[in-house]
């Protein structure tokens, strides 16, 4: 089977939810692709005053995106920095922690279950056979215990995933991104990119790649990966003399903090299956049009997916998996925050937003 189907799979997974702070709708669709490698997480109540939303676009398989959707928000919540009120640091650490957790026997077993290579029952049996070392989990705040087994030396997956997540806490929005999924906010009908697409040809990315011993060919890292940052992709993270953030490909996210205000119309998180077809401003304009007649946010997302789906696979655009989360805030408060509009720039030329790590 090639990378494309003969006819697209247009059935969608859609969902809506709300609490006292916000409401969201989401939708995902496999489309023309031979397999579905996107995943997402929408956690309305990460704690009493915090919501978490994330999109994960896998490549080389679905296991890393599914792993992130299952565990990344848990790592944010369990980190000591989060408990101390430092959301940005907890996000940064959670991205790197994904790579660590996917290694060894435990990581191999979790990925095998998520990849349907062993069923959950088999995984449980294997977990009993290859049991955690006594005492090891006591030193890990997330109780991710080391396991003995035939895959104890597993270096982690060579497949990978983007991660673009938003944490809403009180009046603050934290956005963390690694890869080319994107987060955009509409403020007074203007699109503002809250994340930067990490591509190998960006100067800072190129410098890191070359210093780490990699190369760029045809816009791809070592001629194969069209992203410069991702979770997983461990084959690009094997230089033992470099820290994680300086490897050829790194999971290090840009973290951006924004004060929400009453001018904010909505927030969008979406994988590049959307952004390859529409600019940030085009998507914001399209959503505003739909919101004039449609109140259910998941339906708006579905209309975006249908709008982006290509009639055939000849062009490439509109043929990817598609996932989108749309968020509207309740009772926002005035703010002096200034954002730099980025949708007005040439498509694909996005300045890095101010960030705090």
From Swiss-Prot:
GO cellular component: plasma membrane
Cofactor(s) named in the record: Mg(2+); Mn(2+)
Record's keyword terms, sorted: Hydrolase, Magnesium, Manganese, Metal-binding, Protein phosphatase
Positions bound to Mn(2+) 1: 57-58
Binding site for Mn(2+) 2: 57, 272, 320
Catalytic activity: O-phospho-L-seryl-[protein] + H2O = L-seryl-[protein] + phosphate; O-phospho-L-threonyl-[protein] + H2O = L-threonyl-[protein] + phosphate
InterPro entries: PP2C (IPR015655), PP2C_BS (IPR000222), PPM-type-like_dom_sf (IPR036457), PPM-type_phosphatase-like_dom (IPR001932)
SMART domains, per the entry: PP2Cc
UniProt EC number: 3.1.3.16
One protein family per Pfam: PP2C
Disulfide bonds: none
A molecular function (GO) term: protein serine/threonine phosphatase activity
Coiled coil: none
Manganese in keyword set: yes
Region (Disordered), start-end ranges: 331-357
Note on cofactor: Binds 2 magnesium or manganese ions per subunit.
Family: Belongs to the PP2C family.
Protein name: Probable protein phosphatase 2C 60
Biological source species: Arabidopsis thaliana (Mouse-ear cress)
């Amino acid at each position: 089977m090639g990378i494309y189907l003969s006819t697209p799979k247009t059935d969608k997974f859609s969902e809506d939810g709300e609490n006292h702070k916000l409401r969201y709708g989401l939708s995902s669709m496999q489309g023309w692709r031979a397999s579905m490698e996107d995943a997402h997480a929408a956690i309305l109540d990460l704690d009493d005053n915090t919501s978490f939303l994330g999109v994960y676009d896998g490549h080389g398989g679905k296991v890393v995106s599914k792993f992130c959707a299952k565990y990344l928000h848990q790592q944010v919540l369990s980190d000591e920095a989060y408990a101390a009120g430092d959301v940005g640091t907890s996000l940064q650490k959670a991205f790197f922690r994904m790579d660590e957790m996917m290694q060894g026997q435990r990581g191999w077993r979790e990925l095998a279950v998520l990849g349907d290579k062993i069923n959950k029952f088999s995984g449980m049996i294997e977990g009993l056979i290859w049991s955690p070392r006594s005492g090891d989990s006591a030193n890990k705040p997330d109780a991710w215990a080391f396991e003995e087994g035939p895959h104890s030396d597993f270096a982690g997956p060579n497949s990978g995933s983007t991660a673009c997540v938003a944490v809403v806490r009180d009046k603050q929005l934290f956005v963390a991104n690694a890869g080319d999924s994107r987060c955009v906010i509409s403020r007074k009908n203007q699109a503002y990119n809250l994340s930067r697409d990490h591509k190998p040809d960006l100067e800072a990315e190129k410098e890191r790649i070359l210093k780490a011993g990699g190369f760029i060919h045809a816009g791809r890292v070592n001629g194969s990966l069209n992203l410069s940052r991702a979770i997983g992709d461990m084959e690009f993270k094997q230089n033992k003399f470099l820290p994680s953030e300086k490897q050829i490909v790194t999971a290090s996210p840009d973290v951006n903090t924004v004060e929400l205000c009453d001018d904010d119309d909505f927030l969008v998180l979406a994988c590049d299956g959307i952004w390859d077809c529409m600019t940030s401003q085009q998507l914001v304009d399209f959503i505003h049009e739909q919101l004039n007649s449609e109140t259910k946010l998941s339906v708006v997302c579905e209309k975006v997916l249908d709008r982006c789906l290509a009639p055939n696979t000849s062009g490439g655009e509109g043929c990817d998996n598609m996932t989108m989360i749309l968020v509207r805030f309740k009772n926002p408060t005035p703010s002096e925050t200034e954002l730099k509009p980025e949708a007005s720039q040439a498509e694909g030329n996005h300045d890095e937003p101010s960030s705090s790590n």
